[in-house]
Amino acid sequence: MVSVSEIRKAQRAEGPATILAIGTATPANCVEQSTYPDFYFKITNSEHKTVLKEKFQRMCDKSMIKRRYMYLTEEILKENPSLCEYMAPSLDARQDMVVVEVPRLGKEAAVKAIKEWGQPKSKITHLIFCTTSGVDMPGADYQLTKLLGLRPYVKRYMMYQQGCFAGGTVLRLAKDLAENNKGARVLVVCSEVTAVTFRGPSDTHLDSLVGQALFGDGAAALIVGSDPLPEIEKPIFEMVWTAQTIAPDSEGAIDGHLREAGLTFHLLKDVPGIVSKNINKALVEAFQPLNIDDYNSIFWIAHPGGPAILDQVEEKLGLKPEKMKATREVLSEYGNMSSACVLFILDEMRKKSAQQGLKTTGEGLDWGVLFGFGPGLTIETVVLHSVAI
């Protein structure tokens, strides 16, 4: 008779979870940050709020963002004026948009990832879908399964309203699934659409205005699996270790609440300080077992919540400016896409590493870290091992 331990051993993969493909997608509508304040105050009928507009212009100028992509066009906003007020009841209109657009954008990214992977989609065993918007039943995971034509018995996991740390969460879950289910191939999708958070300006709630200056739309997809098939599957990064923690004394630092007026965001000014104060502890826990204490010797992927967070982390750890190059590039070209950001940065890093003729996918280095920061304040940590190019 076969023992339970023998069954468990047979169920487990031998090697670490590996990212085998990455795909990204954005809406077609591109918004230039330099002209966005004019557009935003005009479309929300707020041009008379000149002092507030000047504040918003300064926020956009300091954001280090060049452009963002948004599903919400001028035409859509004119057809849905309730979205342009500060707190007008508008949830129905928002929901009608995102329940369609979130899976659609996710499909676009997933198709690219599956194409790079090079295997038939029938080999996908698990699906993890993550989005901050559009809670619905059946969920976006179900809709994507139908849109892609995946097998009906794909094992699905749906994550709603986790926010900006969740790019790390999906990697942690994918790692556990791939390593504990021999032969598993996990499709991971993060799809974020800001139609649920867009609203007009308020003189009294400037933290809402910060979100309007930073957030953009985008979707990213990965294929994750252990024990890659030689000559068929091409590893990009290996996931070695993961952790999640709630930063002490951080309650209320980042909050989001679903209301009749959509999803409202609330930020404390000291979010960059809270993150930078707790980052060293997370790094020690992650890299002490590897005997690494020089954090300039590893590659960096950090959720770009905004430039102030990156600046303070750099200063606290004495990081060289080039450490955050891939992270800042994605912030500049796409804005803050919540959970999808760190996956975009993974893609940016492996592509630039190959283009520059470096020896590994991680900017020529062997070890790296990926951080997600978001509501809670929650910190996700993923230790990555790069792959030779």
Swiss-Prot record:
Xref: PROSITE patterns: CHALCONE_SYNTH
Record keywords, A-Z: Acyltransferase, Flavonoid biosynthesis, Transferase
Enzyme Commission number(s) of this protein: 2.3.1.74
GO biological process: flavonoid biosynthetic process; polyketide biosynthetic process
Stored SUPFAM superfamilies: Thiolase-like
Disulphide-bonded residues: none
Pathway: Secondary metabolite biosynthesis; flavonoid biosynthesis
CDD domains referenced in this protein's UniProt entry, alphabetically: CHS_like (cd00831)
Active site: residue positions: C164
UniProt KW Cytoplasm keyword: no
GO molecular function annotation: naringenin-chalcone synthase activity
Reaction catalysis annotation: (E)-4-coumaroyl-CoA + 3 malonyl-CoA + 3 H(+) = 2',4,4',6'-tetrahydroxychalcone + 3 CO2 + 4 CoA
Family statement: Belongs to the thiolase-like superfamily. Chalcone/stilbene synthases family.
Protein role: The primary product of this enzyme is 4,2',4',6'-tetrahydroxychalcone (also termed naringenin-chalcone or chalcone) which can under specific conditions spontaneously isomerize into naringenin.
Protein name: Chalcone synthase 6
Organism expressing this protein natively: Pisum sativum (Garden pea)
Gene assigned in the entry: CHS6
